[in-house]
Amino acid sequence: REKRSTFIQLPSIHLMPIIMSFTVEKEIVQFNGKLQKLVHESDLTKTSMKVNVFLPPALTKAKVPAVLYLSGLTCDPNNATEKSFFQYFASKYGFALIFPDTSPRGAKIAGEDDSWDFGNGAGFYVDATESPWSTNYNMYSYVHKELLSKLGEQYSLQIDFKNLSIVGHSMGGYGALTGFLKNPGQYKSVLAFAPISNPLNCAWGEKCFGNYLGSDKSKWLAYDPTHLIKEYKGEIPEILIHQGAADSFYSTDHQLQPENFAAAAKEAGYKVDLRIVDGYDHLYFFISSFVEEHAKFHAKYLGLKL
């Protein structure tokens, strides 16, 4: 008889695909590290979002901590990467940098391009509750939840997302203070350059909160750092704030009011090192002049060697 071979069919094995959320549009070598310009689709803003990530040379040895940098009104991820010089010190101390955008782009909402301090470039790091903004303008949850979660998947071998700090400038300084205070334990430290410190009490805050959150000012309290620090429970490391004395938004327009935040922090038993520096304005010349102090401050709380 003819012998027949018997084949046993094994069940097929389906390997879980590695899903990359981000597309690298450009990679630039800088200070022996890499600046990656990324784009991805956001579930919360329902638009394509851009973000820049700087990876220091230290990550060739182990995972590195990261600092989240939130930019101010009219900015996109490129402003700080091109003007702050933060990457030099991130490379020196060994931490990554994350530069999100300041609003959704391409939402095509009527009125979002009508002024420079509202809409495009001015998402104000809130989750909007008012129509038509609530569909796309969810920058608070986008930055502190969705973006960090997706980056955590993308850079799971390079960045330690349990060792984060946060900093910001102007609207971004407000966003950093708010994000730190609303997410206890998520960030090791928080610093700010010329932050909008008491938005309930200034024209920028009234305009953005009124449109994004509605007319009920009690809802605004959830995004006001001066209120949030009064309600905070737990440990807070010293908060460093630099403010230029020649900044017209501070001295003339009274949009920033860091003294209000410092006073509220003191009353609540927390320490704020508010440094009013003569001669400096609101621009990146000011930021780049003091970014080394901020980088060193973050490195300390991230457990890095100084």
Regions found by a protein language model. Give the residues of each.
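Short, Lys/Arg-enriched N-terminal segments with co-localized hydrophobic residues
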Residues: 1-19
